Amino acid sequence: MATGSHTTTLLLAVALLGLPWPQEAGAFPAMPLSSLFANAVLRAQHLHQLAADTYKEFERAYIPEGQRYSIQNTQAAFCFSETIPAPTGKDEAQQRSDMELLRFSLLLIQSWLGPVQLLSRVFTNSLVLGTLDRVYEKLKDLEEGIQALMRELEDGSPRVGQILKQTYDKFDTNLRSDDALLKNYGLLSCFKKDLHKAETYLRVMKCRRFVESSCAF
């Protein structure tokens, strides 16, 4: 097998099989910064796609089509992540430093570690259940990846404190209640939006550090 192919296969294995991140700069084998970014982006993409698929599956199963638009228009104000001064898109993200984007990404991921622990119970008969039962572990894995990047890029600037004063409620498993359905629908909408932000920040950082043909998004 060619050396380039072997390297690509190894990186994919690290990204997709959940191998541990290096815990310190001197860990062996050392992982290049480009690989740390590539792995973090792959994990964020996977989680964002999972969140989007889960949202669509819940919407299809529980929310009448005629009510979706009006409900969606009332949800944006209830995403607690909107209360932090994080960039709202790629253009704004490009104006922030890598360390700022990593801190925002970490904050977004950590805000969901509690709520998602009941997520799989909301989809007891769902086709996506097989992946939802490990979403907490996937979030923890991405959290570790972001922390590994922060260790590598530590610039000596003071660490920011906890900005997010509130966090999200846990998902409601009482699917016979209309209020619970609307609550879960809103939470899934915020989950999707927040993971999209985290993915965007990581991709912006990766692309401006390592110029590549796949930077358009």
UniProtKB/Swiss-Prot annotation:
Q: Which domain of life is it from?
A: Eukaryota
InterPro entries found in the cross-reference section: 4_helix_cytokine-like_core, Somatotropin, Somatotropin/Prolactin, Somatotropin_CS
Give the UniProt keywords, A-Z.
Answer: Disulfide bond, Hormone, Metal-binding, Secreted, Signal, Zinc
The entry's localization annotation reads:
Secreted
Q: Name one GO molecular function term.
A: growth hormone receptor binding
Cysteine-cysteine disulfides: 79-190, 207-215
Q: Does the keyword Metal-binding apply?
A: yes
Q: Which residues form the signal peptide?
A: 1-26
Quick one: a GO biological-process term for this protein? growth hormone receptor signaling pathway
- Any idea which positions bind Zn(2+)? 46, 199
Annotated Gene Ontology cellular components are:
extracellular space
User: What is the annotated role of this protein in its UniProt record?
Assistant: Plays an important role in growth control. Its major role in stimulating body growth is to stimulate the liver and other tissues to secrete IGF1. It stimulates both the differentiation and proliferation of myoblasts. It also stimulates amino acid uptake and protein synthesis in muscle and other tissues.
Family, according to the entry, reads as follows:
Belongs to the somatotropin/prolactin family.
Q: What's the protein name?
A: Somatotropin
Task: Write down the species.
Answer: Galago senegalensis (Northern lesser bushbaby)
The gene from which this protein is expressed is GH1
